[in-house]
Amino acid sequence: MLVSGIDDGYFPLKYKGRNGRTVMLSVVFKDYDIIDIDFDFIIVDGDDGTSVLNSLQTGDVCILDGLTFGGFNFVNPSELKSKYIIFYSSKPNIFKITRALDRHFNDERRDIIINVISNLTRVSTLRGDVYIYTNLDLKMAKNIIEEYQVFDRIPLPLKIAHEISSSLSTFLLSKKII
């Protein structure tokens, strides 16, 4: 089974409010080997996260670093083409998220994000409790997470996606590409 880690890159605060782009990146693993990396750009606080993720090369299952990318850009789980595990290493504060959404966004993202956060499932793994929202069987999702919890609670595909996307976006920013 091919498993992807999905994460976004760094962006400066001045990009908030749709004033810039950052990286959305997929790292595809077969067992513990990286077999593919793909990325594209998303608008910070935009609404293109779902379409960009659907255009990336991914594995059979995607482990997403949360539901929001590039600020409050987001993915709509019901529109994703692949199987997914939306992963949180700790429970998000729904009150803070709701307050931020109410202040800045009055569109579908509010309802989608609040619905997912409200319906996270706590899963006890060998490395501690995590919170997920998935379209997989819960036992299968737990097995995938535990298989890739090599060093800590965060699955290896997410750790690597984070490192590469942060480094890539910082590099592209330094070259004034984003």
UniProtKB/Swiss-Prot annotation:
Paired cysteines (S-S): none
Record Pfam families: DUF99
InterPro entries (alphabetical): Endo_dU
Domain of life: Archaea
Similarity section: Belongs to the UPF0215 family.
UniProt name for this protein: UPF0215 protein STK_03040
Highest classification ranks of the organism: Archaea, Thermoproteota, Thermoprotei, Sulfolobales, Sulfolobaceae
